């Protein structure tokens, strides 16, 4: 058998095969380049006696992309001209004839994603959509399973949350606090940044008469933006929330923000002040009309903003991976007359279907990435993140809704939520406001603040590292 030696040759001396029928997209060249950057040039280019490439055209292009001047080559000089022509075809086609054990492949991808490594699983060449489909195949479930949206009766939900509490729910976090306070959001993210946003802020529309009708399901008004704000005030409210979403998410991330048709103007104004681009506006079409006198509203709007200028993720790629997506989303609403709908509506007045959020998450994020929601509501974004292998970071102002999110998570995941920090966010904010007021009035040191210390632990409550976390927050506050 002929012994071959690797030669290191300048790229300029390598000649492409005249009739190379194999094509390489720019995307694939970038993937090969990333593999070479990470693992090295492990597969030498095969050339003939005249430096014509028999195998490795994509690797040579990737090497040029990386700015390399040379590449390792193996010279094959025993073939006839006809053999070479056949080999060039065979080298490309035979690899395509192989298959996959999809269960083993999914397990390997899943374990790679869970390992502590400094590279993304897409370095394997599998797309975000392919990884999602394979791993979801390990534990198949029906899309749009009604059980995903089933919410427990409000009367069955225990009262646990207080303002400022930070909870861990498996890989997810929930904080009870003001989404407009950047310190609350900083506590929630803990130096990480979100890969995408799906959030449903209050619509500045009174719940009574617009969401709650005259039936047995009645709702109190939201804690803020429930119809009491002027146009300017609501625009400022949205702009403050958007500023936090932008600050705590990755450059290039897509932010899905739900809104009623009445406040399109405020959304566009606040969005233009914070986002680089409005990528699209999505219409969620429900299967039944809701409240309304001059036409019953059967849709809601979802604005798809882009944060920053970096390229955004797009996993569906015009249906390339079997997911045909448009800007009209058709999912059933909670006012549909089916079993379980009243329970959902009783938990929260504007529940979004989990299946809809699942699809949005899969469109623009990777498994393991963070999904940020600063208006947690009933917790649908958290359930959707869990189903798709993402990590939710959820903020909700109202302790009652926080209690319902906890209860919903524990029922769905059959896991217990853990309180990991108690009341620090809101108490720190109050303390800082008090300090600022004293400094502004010139009476610092003369007036005693009235900010209360953290309340005594509730029965059965564990407050880990309370002193150290308080010091950490004081230090961060400056």
Which residues make up each language-model segment?
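S-adenosyl-L-methionine
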Residues: 163-186, 406-451
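Core catalytic lobe of class I
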Residues: 2-402, 459-464, 472, 477-478
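Polybasic, lysine-enriched low-complexity intrinsically disordered terminal tails
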Residues: 1-3, 434-478
